[in-house]
């Protein structure tokens, strides 16, 4: 039976000017991931990257640690949703990151404050009631990721394994598909 490993990128640079890059911790995580996969003698017949910088950096560290020199194929179907647009649609003032930062700092616990805002923004996006406010609706995002998995599965031979470097949202969409869950 073929296998698809969905690998979430290492820690991104939350709070920096460019979120779409790994932090120092994220780079270390990518190497540890590769070492773990190598130790388990994980097969890697097909390598896929979602196309974001954090995906590529995770793949580079992981594959180097595994002793693999091949470059992953880029597949935009495994890209993450646009979390910045999702937050801006929820509250247009969040287009200015300083406004978002000020909002979450008011909570006293910035991580929990951000999580609360993010959950509300994600619920709004997933509701389907405001699809015109987004470049990609939740349903379109799920359809895109499902297409990526379906196409990838069709390419794999009977005992082949694919490593897919992606993000948590895409992985969640695959879980949603496999479990037959509703949009909410």
Residue spans for each PLM region:
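Hydrophobic alpha-helical packing residues
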Residues: 33, 37, 121, 148-152
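Short, glycine/charged-enriched secondary-structure capping and boundary segments
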Residues: 19-21, 61-64, 87-90, 177-181
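Short, positively charged
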Residues: 1-2, 116
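Phosphate-handling substructures
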Residues: 68-144
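Active-site-adjacent alpha-helix immediately C-terminal to a catalytic or transition-state-stabilizing loop
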Residues: 56, 135, 139, 143-184
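Active-site-proximal alpha-helix that buttresses catalytic centers in soluble enzyme cores
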Residues: 2-77, 135-140
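Short, solvent-exposed loop/turn segments at secondary-structure junctions
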Residues: 11-13, 53-54, 79-81, 168-171, ...
């Amino acid at each position: 039976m073929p296998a698809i490993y969905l690998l979430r990128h290492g820690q991104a640079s939350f709070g920096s000017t460019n979120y779409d890059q790994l932090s120092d911790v994220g780079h270390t995580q990518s190497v540890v991931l590769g070492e773990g996969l190598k130790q388990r003698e994980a097969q890697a017949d097909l390598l896929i990257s979602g196309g974001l910088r954090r995906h590529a950096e995770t793949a580079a560290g992981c594959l180097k640690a595994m002793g693999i020199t091949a470059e992953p194929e880029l597949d935009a179907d495994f890209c993450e949703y646009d979390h910045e647009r999702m937050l801006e649609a929820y509250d247009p003032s969040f287009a200015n990151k300083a406004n978002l930062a000020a909002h979450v700092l008011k909570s006293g616990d910035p991580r929990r404050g951000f999580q609360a805002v993010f959950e509300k923004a994600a619920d709004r996006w997933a509701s389907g009631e405001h699809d015109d406010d987004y470049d990609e609706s939740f349903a379109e995002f799920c359809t895109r990721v499902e297409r990526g998995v379906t196409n990838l599965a069709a390419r794999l031979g009977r005992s082949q394994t694919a490593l897919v470097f992606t993000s948590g949202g895409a992985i969640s969409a695959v879980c949603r598909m496999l479990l037959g869950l509703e949009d909410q």
